Amino acid sequence: MKKRIVLCLAMAGIFPAVQAQTVVIDSQVTLAEALAGSSAPQEVLDSLAIADVEYYSFDGKLHRGQIVMHKTLKEDVIHRFRFMRNQRFPIESAIPIRFDKPNDGTSMDTLNNSYSFHYRRISTSGNGSRSVHSYGMAIDINPYNNPAVLANGKVIPQGGTYDRDIPGTLADTSPVVKEFIRLGWTWGGNWTSLKDYMHFEKKLP
């Protein structure tokens, strides 16, 4: 009888049937706030969107962050994060990078932060060309766990360690990697000239 009363109260909205899970907020800004001060051309800024994403972080708690990406990839990115959340694949944080600087000494190094849009040059190349991150068409996941390893042995970010046995690390056997590839993304861990384990990119349709 007691269970039946509780169920009726829950259905009436008087007594919660299941206590809502507390979500840790890592980022909660508008697109304008995320892009404030960027040196990107206006046509690039106009092509971007922001998405709220949820993920389990390394503390085991559910977090909510944000990703700025090209607007045509918004639903793709939301789906990818939903997949990682359901897989309990840990993400350190997802906070928009709100300044234009090289990777060294910024979000990648200090926060192990996952992100998409970042108006910058390619950090793994010396030719000075723009990264696809400059257009929000790539996403980096847990850079410390999934660093870029150049042909000369240099690791970016400095201090990053690639160990497949550590949670939050991407590998060719990872369901996360397989899901990205299934939906048309290219993974930097499959490159031959260098290994960029954190990196996924996708050409626009």
Regions found by a protein language model. Give the residues of each.
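Basic/polar, cationic surfaces and motifs that engage anionic cell-wall
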Residues: 186-205
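Boundary at the C-terminal end of the N-terminal hydrophobic targeting segment
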Residues: 18-20
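Residues in and immediately flanking transmembrane alpha helices
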Residues: 15-16, 146
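Sec-dependent N-terminal signal peptides
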Residues: 4-14
